[in-house]
């Protein structure tokens, strides 16, 4: 795990999917929530564990903050709760009762962990203990690796300029008035089975998530 790695250890437990059918069932339940419009945002729990997923959900906007309560979780070890990398997903939803009904119907386990909080603060509570994390400072630490790699690719001056300003660019989307959000607008069909005759390659400039 990432947690074990920063402690210079390998670790003794490996994240695993113990029930493939349950995993598929959970995935399909999440897809249904997305399709029916109940999911506002989401993040997988993987490298770095739940704490990384929570922080990365906050990193996208300077106005975000979370108040999280883990008191309802059976696990008592806060380190395991925060850093375990077993498969899971965090979702921000808009109707707790309807989401709970859908997950209950699918037989998928879930917990309601918290709500939006004060901008720039991630507050975590577990069995009488409270943890207060400063999102902007942790965002800088999180982005620093990208900055150090960017220095090798773009040079010190440009990389430093980006590092100083990356969090000052608010997340905004601007669509043309004619944009409908539908594939059919561009002559695309998600159910197409015949080749289109168009060949394309997507080349990533910045590499991938294996930089650790």
For the regions a language model picked out, list residue spans one by one.
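Intein/HINT protein-splicing elements and their conserved insertion hotspots or analogous self-processing inserts
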Residues: 1-83, 97-199, 207
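Short hydrophobic/aromatic beta-strand micro-patches
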Residues: 90-94
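Short, intrinsically disordered, charge-balanced linker/junction segments flanking boundaries
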Residues: 206-212
